[in-house]
Curated annotation (Swiss-Prot):
InterPro entries the UniProt entry points to: SAM-dependent_MTases_sf, Thiopur_S-MeTfrase_Se/Te_detox, Thiopurine_S-MeTrfase, TPMT
Protein name from the UniProt record: Thiopurine S-methyltransferase
Protein localization: Cytoplasm
GO MF term set: thiopurine S-methyltransferase activity
Listed HAMAP family: Thiopur_methtran (MF_00812)
The encoding gene: tpm
Keywords annotated in UniProt: Cytoplasm, Methyltransferase, S-adenosyl-L-methionine, Transferase
Organism of origin: Shewanella baltica (strain OS195)
One biological process term in Gene Ontology: methylation
Family indicated by similarity: Belongs to the class I-like SAM-binding methyltransferase superfamily. TPMT family.
UniProt xrefs under SUPFAM superfamilies: S-adenosyl-L-methionine-dependent methyltransferases
Amino acid sequence: MEPGFWHEKWHQQQIGFHQQDINPFLVKYWQKLGLPADTQVFVPLCGKSLDMCFLAEQGHQVIGCELNELAVQQFFSDIQLEMTQTTVGEHQHYHTEQISLYQGDIFTLPKAITQEVTAFYDRAALIAWPECMRAQYAKQLASLLPSGSVGLLVTLDYPQEALSGPPFAVSPTWVEQHLSDDFDIGVLASQDVLADNPRFIKKAVPWLNEAAYLLKRK
């Protein structure tokens, strides 16, 4: 999946993947990570997610990475926060006192940016990649996270043949097979969310499960 795909989605505002509300799993399970308020939290492929506001409200320092410039600008505009913009290598750095967003390719994000991170949150990143690219992203995420980092991973699973992604289906089996080398994995929850997703109902997708995992970088 080329960068142009995502740039076009944002340009056309075809952003059905963007949630208007804070993710319920984040609200319910984030406290299980037991993090101090001043923790640095990495949010890959963050878009303009309001989940970052929730994390900031917990006292955390939020570090996001997002490919599309418009997404980053809309985030700060939507929440009415003034930010400062600088250039860091190949990335544009937009930041306030608590939120730092690096606009650019996650595969070229300098590791120095995340060297003090001790937590991460992935709701829309892993499921954004088709299977042929997903393992590469998972390895990049692991490489950016210091050992001992803990995180909340949220996935969707459904019969992939019933609907072309994104979001793409990520099964519990895929999570175990591709993440267990780098992370300790615990399942927090898995529930049917088909009734809350009209797009999937319209396409006659027979079932849709959302799962939450607690991960710890080895």
